Amino acid sequence: VPFSLNRRQLLGSIGILAGSTLLESSSSEAFASALGATLLPKSKWLQHENSRAGSTEWLSHKGASIGALDGYASTTSVNRGESLNLFVSTTYASFIVKVFRMGYYQGLGARLIETSSKVTGHVQTIPSPDQLGTVDCNWESSLQLSIGHHYPPGQYLALLVAPDQTGRFVPFLVRDDSSKAAFVYMSSVTTWQAYNAWGGFSLYRGANQDGDDGFNDATRADVVSFNRPYSRSMQNGAGDFLGNEFPFLFLAEQLGLDMTYWTSLDLHERGNLLSSHKALLSLGHDEYYSPAMRDAVTTAVSNGLNVSFFGANFIYRKIRFEPSANGHCRLMVNYRSTADPIMATNPQLATVNWQDYPSGIASSTFTGSYWGGVDGAGSLEVENASTWLWANTGLSNGAVLPNALGGEFNHYVTTAVNPANVEILASSNVGGGESDVTYVAAANGGGVFCSGTGHWIYDLSNFPKLYALQQGYMLAPPIANVTFPIRRATVNVLSLFGSGPAGASQPSTSTPN
């Protein structure tokens, strides 16, 4: 489920913010030193980039009213040297665009890259959903961005700003396809789009808006389009970035990691490039996978790539992509059953859940981690505190991190198809059963780390310079006695995974049942 933070949760954390010792050091270097992060593969260009003047202006605009200002990008990611179009519909006579690169930047979270001149605004037609629930806009381009050298690789938010200073985000990512960086940061845009109900339909919600808070509506869409904005309810158009991904990006850029940037669509289209890297970093909610995406990951792991799943419910829904009038891979298909018309001609592409017929391949087959459910709230209970994951956290066996777990959860299931030597590093009781932190790595092989909770990224949140500035409640607060040890454990994963096949130095040891 996409990250959300309500007012009650935020107000309940004010005391933590006021008195917490978890808040970051005044400098990136001091924080990195405190975490003992000197063994991390680092990038001089990224360290230099984050030393540049940051800006909090990205947080200074209230969200525009629904239907007043909306936009989307021509692609989820763009390689340096290419261009990207923004398609905007607005009731305002004009607007401007401010483009921010997201990162650490002295704790301010972003750097302003450029500001457009005034753009003439006009209302563009919202198409009616077709018989599959697809809302596929065919808008005219409002502005083209030339992605030159002034656009370093990274995650971007374009902020559409109206004359009354309200705004709406349009996310996109800048790649460097020549990169040989140790880490691939991957933004889970396929999952963002699955939950995006702009235009009235998503892969969960439809005309009836029934079911569990609108989820699993019988009239939901079977095909959704990337040619549409993200809804206002998705963090003012930012998709699922600010809640389920930004806390990790903020930390990673603070540490100056040797990192390149992909979306999940890039895994589909250029997954062969994983061989140039040491680790793939999957973030808070990475649920929707095409066969090409899954094959790229499993092949790379068998060849020594490390993969971290810092969320839960990963590789669960099987999808395929189709072209639209506006480009290839702009439509995402997910029937969730054998009613998928492709069953008649190519059943292996039928968009069932991955573990169901005719696919029959659960995520546990190479991870040892199986989806458990949506009621994953609870406290994390540490096992095997002497292992590498918990080093320098100050935690001992049986230590409890209160309220560290939430959202969906994964666990180790003995009756599932699992790889050998699945090691359980924490096992915790949650509302829906048991949540497990797992690790698996064959001798000299690639390692796979699974946090087992949808809140691992949430637990990294630590934005002391930003909370008072945010419009609404988009940024999660730190959690007392949780944020530091989870940050430390995350750095331990990065330290191990950034050095090559994790099994060469840290093969997993099967945890007794």
Feature names for model-found ranges:
Residues F95, V135-S179:
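Extended acidic/polar, glycine-enriched regions
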